[in-house]
Amino acid sequence: MTTAIIGTGNIGGQVARHLVAGGEPVVLAARDESHATALANELGPLASAAPVRQAIAEAEVVVLAVWLDTSKQLIVENGDLLHHKVIVDPSNPIQLDGKGGFSRTLPDEQSAASVIAGLLPADAPLVKAFGTLGAEALASSANRRPRRAVLFYATDDEAAAATVERLITTAGFDAVKAGGLSDATRIEVAGDLHQYGGMNGNVVDADEARVAVALAA
């Protein structure tokens, strides 16, 4: 199985590094193709770079590691290639506020995942994942010992869940399901299961994560 990672910034780059370290082949794409090529060269033979449409076509899983508005544009432009792909959305509905912080771009009750899901083909299952930690923690917490760090995910599709659980494990984390896509706000920024929300900056292990999921279930 090949995973396409669209976007090679703070999140996409770290996801690519962790997957390759775990032996997973990836194909990278970025708005500036030189960035994808440079990262692929850094990561070695399990990584390649391609234009966006080629990367999507070559992969079974597509990670949209870009800002929400860019994800929306990518889906509109490449929807014909997304049929039967597992789509992974790590985005958060935020924007820079010009004061060193962030502000939400959606109403509090609306998730980025719900926006993405509404644009995807019906046969392209969506999994909210790889966005529950900040970039620094995502980079430093893979294969943590003695207790592995958790990445939460949410989806309505059991087959897609199994696929993404395997990728999370390969990347060096434990996977804990937060619920279906209706629960995605819990694992986006300011949600009770996000590092920069109810987790108060902490990176939890599997036991702590399951307790946290159950508290608001």
Would you name each region that the model predicts?
Residues P25, L46-S48, V86, P125, ...:
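Conserved beta-strand segments of alpha/beta enzyme cores
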Residues G44-A47, P51-V86, P90-G100:
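Rossmann-like NAD(P)-binding element
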Residues S34, E42, S111, G118-L126, ...:
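Internal alpha-helical scaffold of NAD(P)-dependent oxidoreductase catalytic cores
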Residues T37, V76, S114, G118:
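Active-site phosphate/pyrophosphate- and oxyanion-stabilizing loops and adjacent acidic/basic residues
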Residues M1-P45:
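NAD(P)+-binding Rossmann beta1-loop-alpha1 motif at the extreme N-terminus of oxidoreductases
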Residues S91-A142:
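Rossmann-fold NAD(P)-binding glycine/threonine-rich loop
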